[in-house]
């Protein structure tokens, strides 16, 4: 029997949902009643005699997450991280845009610039995302407080289970990222930058961050499964451009005698410079190394945007 056929025939999830909702005074109507009341903050009340416990959500949003989780797991057999759902304001969503959803981040002028750009765009259009979710463990979803109850159900299913499953199961996210590590890494990086600003001065740190930002898209640590010898017969980019006359200055510099450098297979420029630059102070090496890890974390998100929205 195909997996699709098994999904179509599987009705056990309905029994699980019934068993869950049977503990509440509104029962199955709890979602329709919230729609009619036009609020996702609709009260969910347990029936008399039902003792509160961790398996019975005490908020409407929590109950939506629980029901969606039953459908995701029992009907579609989706593997996901645990969820954290936060209901946020428009101002908080603009902040999330600026930090790409990360709950902690260091300070830099470029983030303030992005924040102003997003705010101006919002004032013109009054449009913001219904949700943002980040690849972390637990997965953190930010849902707009202006969402209607039905939209809240949709975005929780979409973000907290659709995107969540993609983050957990897609091979690029498995190979390039550690979902449990990104929030602690971001916190450690923020704290390190703050301490360095106090010890070495904001200007010195800012100049380093400017350089790191310029190299971020060229700082991807390739996993072992792609670090392979070039197959015989495969055309490299440099072969395509062989014979092209380059500028004299470039040729003169490129052909200048010097000590050969063994780059190995390291493709993360930030990490390579941090490890090999001869006169770099240790605090700069540490920041560059951590920035290289953050850059690698965002790589699969750029590569899978269409597929992730599936």
Question: What residue spans do the PLM features occupy?
Answer:
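Fold-level signature of zinc-dependent metallopeptidase catalytic domains
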Residues: 52-60, 143-146, 166, 175-184, ...
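Charge-rich, solvent-exposed alpha-helical interaction surfaces
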Residues: 13-23, 27-30, 63-66, 70, ...
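Short pre-active-site segment immediately N-terminal to the catalytic Zn-binding motif
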Residues: 138-155, 298-306
